[in-house]
């Protein structure tokens, strides 16, 4: 296994953190006394492979997070989170050692969008000593849309066998678009 993980943190505007993360990974294996074969989907012939990818071999992952606020009201923030990565490997069912992890899922990609409004900050106590949230340090109300583009990212397969002993892979997908409303209190 080997990899490289690079992260750059910064602020496009003061007080609003942003970052870019790039990961390059390689996790390969070779089982003793097993001749590994690789075959592309739809191909009739196989080719020999010295090493095959392990189930966690995601070759590349790129994530970006950007945050901003309204210049006239720093209590209102917005953020965008973007992730893209190569697909994870998978193989045929039944712990197949010869054709081990020869295929890959489609690339993973997702965009999240969020808006947040600061309801209270303890530094405001002098201005508003009777505020209902004065017992907290900070209070935020946020609305987030996860998987904004409603992408169907495949997580795994459920294998179904027919009476003629053929196997079919039925995809299992990660969550679709979700809307999240949250109230956060810091004490």
Task: Label each PLM-derived region with a short phrase.
Residues 2, 56-62, 107-111, 137, ...:
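Residues that define the transmembrane beta-barrel architecture of outer-membrane proteins
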């Amino acid at each position: 296994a080997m990899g490289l993980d690079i992260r750059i943190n910064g602020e496009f505007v003061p007080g609003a953190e942003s970052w870019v993360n790039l990961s390059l990974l390689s996790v390969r294996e070779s089982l003793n006394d097993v001749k590994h074969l690789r075959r592309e989907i739809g191909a009739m012939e196989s080719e020999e492979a010295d090493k095959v990818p392990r189930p966690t071999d995601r070759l590349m992952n790129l994530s970006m997070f950007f945050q901003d606020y309204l210049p006239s009201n720093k209590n209102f923030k917005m953020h965008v989170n973007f992730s893209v990565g190569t697909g994870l490997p998978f193989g045929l069912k039944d712990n197949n050692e010869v054709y081990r992890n020869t295929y890959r899922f489609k690339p993973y990609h997702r965009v999240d969008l969020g808006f947040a409004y600061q309801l209270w900050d303890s530094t405001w106590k002098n201005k508003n000593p009777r505020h209902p949230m004065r017992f907290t340090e900070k209070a935020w109300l946020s609305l987030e849309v996860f998987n904004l583009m409603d992408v169907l990212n495949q997580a795994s397969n459920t294998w179904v066998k027919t009476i003629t002993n053929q196997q079919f892979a039925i995809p299992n997908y990660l969550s679709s678009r979700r809307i999240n409303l949250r109230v956060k209190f810091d004490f």
